[in-house]
Each structure stands twice: as C-alpha cells, then as structure tokens.
Amino acid sequence: MIRYTFIVATVAATLLAVASRAVAQAVPATPLFQTLLQDPLYRKAKAAALAFQRKSWEQGIVGTAFLEAGDDETVIALARASLIYPTKDGLIAGVGGATVDPLMFGESLWHAADVTKDPALRKAADTMLDFTLNKAPRAADGTIFHTGQTIWSDSFNTSPPFLAYAGKYDQAVQQIEGHWKRLWDPQAKLIAHQWNEAANRFSSKTPWGGGNGWAAAGITRVIRYLPADHQADRDKLIAHLKDLLDGCIAHQRPDGLFNDTVNDPKSFVETDTAQMLAYSIYESVRGGWLDKSYLTAADKMRAAARGKVDDAGFVQGVATAPTFDKPGVSPEGQAFFLMMEAAHAKLVQETK
C-alpha cells in the first residue's frame, strides 16, 4: 500500500511538473512584465498582493492586475486556483461577498481559458458569461444588482469590463449606463455609493473614494475594449469618464491623495483612490481619449502612492480590508498599485 501510494504520488508530481513546464513555455514573460520586474517596489507589491487571503472580488482585481501587466503565468495560476471555490450558481472564486463579486474575475478567467484551452477553465468562463447575461438578478431595465435590490458603485468594475472583454459590447455599455443614471450625482459631480432600486432612492449618497475609483477603472477598460464600430458608445463613455475624473480631481489634496469621502476633508486620507484614478488616466491618455493635461494630476497621485509602500511591499493608507472604515491595507490596494504601475509603464514605453 505504501509503495502504491508512493508511485501514485510520484506520477502525480511528474504530471504536475510537466504541466507547469508546458504552461511556462506557453506563456513567456512579456517585455512589459520584464520591465515592471526591474522595479524593486513592484516586485515587493506583487509578493504582498499574493500573500493576502482573498475573497471573490479581491481575487478578481488581483487577477486583473496581472492581466494588465502581461503576467499570464500568474493569471492562469489564479484562475486554476479559483476553480476549487464554486458558488451555487456555478461561478468560481466564490469566497464571500455579493452575488456579482465573482464577475470581477471574468476578464482574467476568459483570458486564461483562451490561452490554455483548458476545458475546465473554458467551462467556468462560459458559465460565468451565461450567468451575467441571463441569470444575475437585475432591475427592470437590465441593470444587474450588486446585492439584494441595490446597485453599487463597485459594480462598474464587475460585469461591464467582463462583458466587453468577452465581446458582449452592447450589454457592457448597457450596464455602465444603468449604473451611471442611478449613481452619478450631478450636484456633487461624483459617483454616489449605493442605490436602492426597490425604494427608488440612494441608500448611500456618500461619494466614497473607492467607489469613484472602481467606476473610473471599469469605464476605462470598457472604452478600451469597444471596437471602432461602437464609436458612439465610446464617445458617451468617454464623456462620463471625463466628468468623473474632473469631479474627483477638483478635490485632490496638495499631497496628491484624496479623502476617503472625496468631498469631505474631515474623512481620513486614503491611498487607493489615487492609484485607481492614476491607472485610469494613464490608460486613457495612452488610448488617446484623454488629454495629456491630466498627467499632472496622475503623476502626483502616483508619486504619493509609491511613497506609501512599506518595506514588505504593502501599500499603506488604503481603506482597510475587510471593513473599509479606516486606513490600512487591502488586496485592492495592492492590485491597483500594480495596475497603476503597469499603465504608467505602457504609457512611457509607447511615448518614447
């Protein structure tokens, strides 16, 4: 029995090693990722990101960070690891959170399935898309609920980028528009945090910095994914993004950061909003739909955020997990540092 167990274990280890070598050969490091790894701060922040215990949306945004960096090896590993936590709806990465939170992993999962041709990943990706299109609870106009019958600013970064990445462009735009019409506060010129559809009113009108960052990041990627024959939709989303960025930048602190409630200087100073907005600006300037004048604000954000990375690679001062009610650390904070750095590196490389 011992000998049999040893043989089985040896064979399994051999197969795993072969599979690992195959993946490594199939996904060589991109020039962008090689450039990022030359920065000690990036390497530390990456290690810290992977050290966190993560819930579904956290796994999702960490996956996006490595997808944005061209680090396919890590994206594929995260996707395969997420298969062990299915939800009752058949979604993966189902560790805590709201109904739509696993959708934040959609882009990475779809990409991993395409790259590896792994049947298990393909099935998981197709199941997630079917859920998003047909089964996720939603309002009468099709806008997907975050939890219960509420719509949150966080969800700008769940279903819309995934739908666009999977080629469902009209549905992605529909989700952005449905969230925008409920959550955009034209008086504050900021995104409110939560809308209660059943009560037809805000359940939280607070312009949370993280929520505005989620919105900017999600809209940015949808714009990037939309093809040329969706120019009218692109123009509409670009206008939303500019309004959002202008509204936030009006409240940027002299140190480059923002308060946790964007328009309330009495709320604590928070790091992640700056990273999220800087990422959005760098990507948008690189994409050509945002003027270079925004780089002044983005560079201040980036400099401030880089100054918040501690010796272990943790980005300090973000709205802390799991309560988000005080400064601390979080997987989101790590992810958006990495995304900001990747977007900045792409912009620098392409403007040399």
Task: List each model region and its residues.
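Extended ligand-binding clefts on enzyme/binding-domain cores
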Residues: T150-D154, P160-V262, S267-A278, K292-V318, ...
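Bacterial N-terminal signal peptides
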Residues: V8-A17
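Extended ligand-binding groove/face enriched in aromatic
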Residues: I76, Y85-A198, S203-K205, D311
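Sec/Tat signal peptide C-region and signal peptidase I cleavage site
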Residues: S20-A24
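Bacterial N-terminal signal peptides that target proteins for export
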Residues: M1-A9
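CBM-like carbohydrate-recognition segments
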Residues: A26-G106, A112-T127, F131, K135, ...
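Compositionally biased, low-complexity linear motifs
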Residues: Y4, E73-T74, P207, G213
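Residue-level signal for well-ordered alpha-helical scaffold segments within enzymatic catalytic domains
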Residues: Y4, A65-E68, E107, H111, ...
